[in-house]
Amino acid sequence: MENQENERIKKAFQNKNWPEIKSSDSWNIFKIMAEFVDGYETLSKIGPCVSVFGSARTKPGTKYYEMATEIGQKLASVGLGVITGGGPGIMEAGNLGAHKEKGASVGLNIELPFEQSSNPYIDRDKLINFNFFFVRKVMFMKYAQGFI
């Protein structure tokens, strides 16, 4: 398993010459478009939400983790969904709060080598995995009525 992961990472960072890099860009448009469509179709059905941003390194039991959980609960209690980056820390806490109130708990996860998987408090039908940061950022902005 570790060997496969190492090979995947090596392949991602292979040296390519300039024409190879540029010619592959034109085909990426289809991957980018697919991520936009997936995001639009999923998020347009959820209703009003607030995007919650914060550190992935904040641990459960700390002051800021507890505050983010409380914020998620309060948002969900007034009918607002919570959108986070889907990871641990403040993101997890915001999703946990929404989950406790049975509100919409959305995760916009990014697929990166060495990064976390999504947290367990995201509604599985509201988890979207992205490969492109800029598409993910659009979703944070387009479907939020507020930002924390």
Residue ranges: model-predicted function:
Residues 5-6, 15-108, 116-117:
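Glycine-rich beta-alpha loop segments
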Residues 89-147:
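Acidic/glycine-enriched connector segments
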Residues 1-2:
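Charged, compositionally biased N-terminal leader segments and the immediate start
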